[in-house]
């Protein structure tokens, strides 16, 4: 049986493949969500899994649910740059006032990225 760390490493690799295989985007998203939910069933406070699930949900347009999950990782004390960046991305997508999401971007600058997490997609040209 694979360790949680190995499973998260595979999630990061699979997430990168979404962008290379857009024809299979939905199928890969479903696999990512299932794997992350399985990890969270074993370790409900795994902040890397929460951050990645929030990113996948954001990429799927489920921003309110993504924000709730990401804020859970904040409440658990995560100091991952990708967490705070992802919260800002979700807040932009939800149309929240810039002064609110700028706080998260500023906080993100104080941390480093965990290699077991990834950023949600953000298209600055869409705004």
Question: What name fits each language-model region?
Answer:
Residues 4-20, 33, 47, 51-52, ...:
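Alpha-helical tetratricopeptide repeat
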Residues 32, 66, 100-101:
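Single-residue signature of alpha-solenoid repeat helices
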Residues 37-40, 74, 108-109, 116:
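A conserved position within tetratricopeptide repeats
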Residues 44, 78, 112-113:
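Short coil turns that delineate tetratricopeptide repeat
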Residues 51-52, 82-87, 102-103, 116-123:
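Alpha-solenoid helical repeat scaffolds
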């Amino acid at each position: 049986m694979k360790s949680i760390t190995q499973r998260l490493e595979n999630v990061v690799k699979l997430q990168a493949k979404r962008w290379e295989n857009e024809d299979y985007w939905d199928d890969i998203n479903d696999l990512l969500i299932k794997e992350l939910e399985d990890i969270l069933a074993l370790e409900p406070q795994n902040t890397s899994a929460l951050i990645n699930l929030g990113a996948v949900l954001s990429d799927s347009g489920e921003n309110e649910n993504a924000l709730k999950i990401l804020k859970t990782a904040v409440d658990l004390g995560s100091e991952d740059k990708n967490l705070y960046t992802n919260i800002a991305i979700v807040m932009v997508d939800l149309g929240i006032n810039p002064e609110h999401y700028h706080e998260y971007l500023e906080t993100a600058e104080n941390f480093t990225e965990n290699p077991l997490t990834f950023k949600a997609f953000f298209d600055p040209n869409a705004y």
